[in-house]
Design a protein with these regions (language model features):
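Terminal leader/tail segments of proteins
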Residues: 1-132
Length: 132
């Protein structure tokens, strides 16, 4: 990831220069199911992978466009977290399901603008996240 030249640069890259984030189109159809219902279905997911000094530090996370998520199945919560590379995350619970199962970087740092208007799901809080 190259340093930002915009107005909202990620501070994490200065503090942790060995950390990298790669994003690319998933290239496959992604579906998320919960209680047997498809709650997200897209051919436009972004795969995000984080590494530190060349070693992967977390599983790939798929960010799905909001337009491809059944937003009426989600309830926004007050939970927030901060990532020095991506920005502030907002969370959603699944209706009649686990709390804070979904997150979104609604105003991500410049370097992560590709995940704006997208949602990610915790795999252990849904039935499946599958690629077809």
């Amino acid at each position: 990831m190259k340093p930002s030249t915009g107005n909202n640069p990620a501070p994490g890259y200065k503090k942790y220069p060995g950390h990298s984030i790669t994003t690319k189109p998933a290239g496959v159809r992604m579906r998320v199911t919960f209680k047997g219902e498809v709650i997200a279905d897209t051919k436009d997911a972004i795969a995000l992978e984080e590494a530190m000094s060349g070693s992967t530090v977390a599983p790939v996370v798929y960010y799905i466009p909001r337009k491809d998520v059944k937003m009426d199945r989600l309830v926004r919560t007050g939970h927030r977290t901060h990532c020095p590379f991506k920005g502030d995350a907002s969370y959603f619970s699944l209706k009649n399901g686990p709390e804070n199962a979904v997150w979104s970087y609604e105003q991500p740092y410049d370097e992560m603008s590709v995940i704006k208007d997208r949602l990610a799901f915790y795999p252990d809080k849904v039935d499946s996240i599958s690629a077809a």
